Swiss-Prot record:
Protein name, entry field: Uncharacterized tRNA/rRNA methyltransferase MAB_0572
Any one Gene Ontology BP term: RNA processing
Family to which the UniProt record says this protein belongs: Belongs to the class IV-like SAM-binding methyltransferase superfamily. RNA methyltransferase TrmH family.
Enzyme Commission identifier(s): 2.1.1.-
Location of the region described as Disordered in the Swiss-Prot/TrEMBL record: 1-53
Keyword set includes DNA-binding: no
One GO term describing the cellular component: cytosol
Organism name: Mycobacteroides abscessus (strain ATCC 19977 / DSM 44196 / CCUG 20993 / CIP 104536 / JCM 13569 / NCTC 13031 / TMC 1543 / L948) (Mycobacterium abscessus)
UniProt keyword list: Methyltransferase, S-adenosyl-L-methionine, Transferase
GO MF: RNA binding; RNA methyltransferase activity
InterPro entries: Alpha/beta_knot_MTases, Ribosomal_eL30-like_sf, rRNA_MeTrfase_TrmH, SpoU_MeTrfase, SpoU_subst-bd, tRNA_m1G_MTases_N
Binding site for S-adenosyl-L-methionine: 268, 288, 297
Gene3D superfamilies: 3.30.1330.30, 3.40.1280.10
Pfam families, sorted: SpoU_methylase, SpoU_sub_bind
Length: 315
């Protein structure tokens, strides 16, 4: 007979497949059927993989918080930003160059400056550089900046005491722009200040942008972080430091400020000004008299004006 109809096993013997139980309507059998696709192990709360995934999420969240606080290495991307960092002496640990990157004057100078500074120069495949820069626009060049090593607020006062000079300190309140931070650091260094203190939270950090704006002053002037800025200011008051706030609505004009003694200038943001607690802590709040219709100055410009006046009085 044609075909495989006579092959042993080709025809199921009667009674080999049990149907639904008579009288049950197949309910008990259907109850054993699956309830859909099994979710991934990471989504099953009691599975070890889910616990591991939860731990990894916590680690990632913590890392993200540290990144926001400037406690992690930073990647500067692009040929112009990288070259500017190297020209201004921003400390770096590695210069990454993509394999096959188009050579131009910026790339050549960046490699030369990195070599002169003893910075490691690493040639990496472009996909690796894409991954390292989280697919940012790197133009085949990236510079790794180590996290800034902040001083303690007490170190700033100790530095002033060691130089046997009246202390000149600057505290920043609500300053979120790293360019303002860098410009203020530059002014403090230019006018003989002993350091800058910033809050640990809700403040700009010493990033590559701040480094570049400071024109290298961040390498010479210590920047400290205060867990609680108000508490730090009160501690300085107890040690004989006059706390002077800088605000457009201040009750004392800059012309009447006595800047000869130990002083700490607190600079608020152009928009928010000084926070309420910091303002209450100040011994005086100074304003800068202006002849024109401008109501306020940029925070870094205002800080420079006050520091220049204090330096003039001390000469």
């Amino acid at each position: 007979m044609a075909g495989n109809s006579q092959r042993r096993g080709a025809v199921r013997k009667p009674g080999t497949k049990k149907g639904p139980t008579v009288g049950s309507g197949g309910v008990r059998r259907r109850g054993l059927e699956g309830k859909g696709a099994t979710p991934p192990a990471e989504q099953r709360t009691k599975h070890p993989a889910a616990k591991r995934a939860a731990v990894q999420r916590k680690i990632a969240d913590a890392k993200q918080r540290r990144l926001k606080q400037g406690d992690e290495a930073e990647m500067v991307l692009g040929r112009n930003p990288v070259l500017e960092c190297l020209r201004t002496g921003v400390p770096a640990t590695a210069l990454y160059v993509a394999v096959g990157a188009d050579n131009d004057e910026r790339l050549t100078e960046s490699v030369a400056l990195a070599a002169d500074a003893g910075i490691a120069i690493l040639e990496v495949p472009r996909p690796d550089l894409d991954r390292m820069s989280t697919n940012g626009l790197h133009q085949g060049l990236a510079l790794q900046i180590p996290p800034y090593k902040y001083a303690h607020p007490d170190d700033l006062l100790a530095r002033a005491r060691a130089e046997a000079q009246p202390a000149l300190l600057v505290a920043l309140d609500n300053i979120s722009d790293p360019r303002n931070l860098g410009a203020i650091v530059r002014s403090v260094a230019a006018f003989g200040g002993h350091g800058v203190v910033i809050p640990q939270r809700r403040s700009a950090s010493v990033t590559a942008v701040a480094w570049r704006t400071s024109a290298g002053a961040a390498a010479r002037l210590p920047v400290a972080r205060a867990t609680n800025l108000t508490r730090t200011l009160k501690d300085w008051q107890d040690k004989g430091i006059t706390i002077v706030g800088l605000d457009a609505g201040g009750d004392t004009e800059l012309d009447n400020l006595d800047g000869v003694g130990d002083i700490a200038v607190v600079v608020g943001s152009e928009g928010k000004g000084l926070s309420q607690l910091v303002r209450k802590t100040c011994d005086a709040v100074v304003s800068i008299p202006m002849a024109g219709p401008v109501e306020s100055l940029n925070a870094s410009v205002a800080a420079g004006v006050v520091l220049a006046e204090i330096a003039r009085q001390r000469r």
